[in-house]
């Protein structure tokens, strides 16, 4: 498929399904939205949750068999995608608010599940998550802000974020440098197309010599924003069409989220960003403090070339299995990195069947 023919934010990647949009608001005043793809009546509903700077688009891409279509074709007759405050479809990541993942776990997911339940009732809900969506949704489950999840799949990272050394340095010094010296409070993979000699354009040019794996400026910026000096996916796993669409599929990232990630990396687990914040007084300081009591079955996915969160999910699986044996599974994906597990050209053959097997075993 010619990437020029793929419209930004298109829903055309999911065929033969009834599509409906369901906006909702959070307790702290943000407008968010769910998209419902319904084909048949079913007892098990699947919710797809993206990561930071991507959006629901990563699950409905038309250039190859996407996850939403795969699940519908495999008998899960109702699939929902969520766009929350981390979504590239919204302006929140490029604004000046200093949101944290506590905000996401406290406000976004409870509101999303309430809206979802309003339409599906008490049917079973299985949640598939990616990147910081996996971290924050896991936080919500372990904090109890969302309940009644039949199964949870987490790609790349979850409750034990770990990064390469270079990433730790960027997490430490990047936010203050961006906010107080370079300029904007966010990083954007589209800086390569910014007006010449602007700060964003200059940053893109400065990054380029260190990322010689391709000629796509957005790919270089994404590697700089998230990779440990290497791309966030294995290039041989990505369709050239998808690679050319990176500026459409990824948006800005507010650097304050990096501060929260750094705090977790240093703590070795998911922790609250600010213990003194009265808004989050009911959230645990340590999200793993009652981990043994969480009964939700979890599948951890990770590529063996994950240059963003390295062995985070391997370590998380080992830790949670020591606390609650038998509730957690791990699948290591040969040749895959961070993003390509869900967005890769052959993910429907290499990755999705493993997720499907887990879902079917946890379904009624």
Regions found by a protein language model. Name each.
Residues 327-364:
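Catalytic active-site module of serine/aspartate enzymes centered on a nucleophile-bearing elbow/loop
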Residues 118-122, 132-272:
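Alpha/beta-hydrolase-fold enzymes
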Residues 307-314:
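Conserved alpha/beta-hydrolase "acid-adjacent" motif
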Residues 6-38:
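N-terminal cap/lid segment of alpha/beta-hydrolase-fold proteins
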Residues 294, 300-302:
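Short beta-strand/loop motif that positions the catalytic acidic residue
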Residues 26, 33-91, 313:
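Short, surface-exposed "cap/lid" segments of acyl-processing enzymes
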Residues 98-119:
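Alpha/beta-hydrolase active-site loop
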Residues 50, 125-134, 303:
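Conserved alpha/beta-hydrolase "nucleophile elbow" surrounding the catalytic nucleophile
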């Amino acid at each position: 498929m010619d990437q020029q023919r793929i419209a930004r934010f298109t829903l055309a990647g999911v065929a033969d399904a009834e599509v409906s949009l369901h906006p909702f608001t959070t307790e702290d005043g943000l407008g968010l939205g769910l998209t419902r793809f319904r084909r048949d009546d079913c007892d098990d509903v699947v919710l797809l949750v993206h990561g930071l700077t991507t959006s629901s688009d990563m699950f409905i891409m038309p250039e190859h068999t996407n996850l939403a279509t795969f699940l519908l074709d495999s008998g899960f007759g109702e699939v929902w995608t969520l766009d929350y405050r981390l979504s590239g479809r919204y302006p929140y990541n490029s604004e000046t608010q200093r949101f944290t993942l506590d905000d996401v776990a406290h406000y976004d997911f409870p509101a999303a599940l309430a809206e979802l339940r309003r339409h599906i009732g008490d049917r079973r809900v299985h949640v598939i998550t990616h990147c910081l969506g996996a971290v924050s949704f896991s936080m919500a489950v372990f904090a109890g802000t969302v309940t009644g999840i039949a199964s949870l799949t987490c790609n790349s990272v979850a409750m034990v974020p770990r990064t390469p050394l270079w990433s730790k340095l960027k997490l430490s010094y990047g936010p203050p440098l961006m906010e107080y010296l370079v300029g904007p409070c966010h990083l954007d993979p589209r800086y390569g197309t910014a007006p010449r000699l602007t700060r964003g354009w200059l940053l893109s040019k400065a990054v380029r010599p260190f990322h010689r794996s391709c000629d796509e400026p957005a790919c270089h910026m994404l590697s700089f924003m998230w990779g440990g000096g290497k791309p966030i996916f294995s290039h041989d796993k990505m369709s050239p069409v998808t690679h050319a669409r990176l500026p459409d599929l990824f948006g800005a990232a507010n650097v304050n989220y990096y501060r929260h990630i750094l705090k977790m990396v240093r703590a070795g687990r998911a922790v609250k960003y600010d213990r003194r914040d009265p808004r989050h007084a009911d959230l645990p300081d340590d999200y793993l403090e009652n981990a043994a009591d969480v009964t939700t079955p979890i599948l951890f996915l990770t590529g063996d070339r994950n240059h963003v969160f390295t062995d985070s999910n391997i370590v998380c699986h080992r830790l949670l299995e020591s606390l609650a044996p038998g509730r957690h599974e791990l699948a290591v994906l040969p040749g895959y990195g961070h993003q390509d597990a869900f967005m890769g050209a052959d993910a429907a053959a290499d990755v999705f069947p493993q997720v499907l097997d887990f879902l079917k075993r946890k379904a009624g």
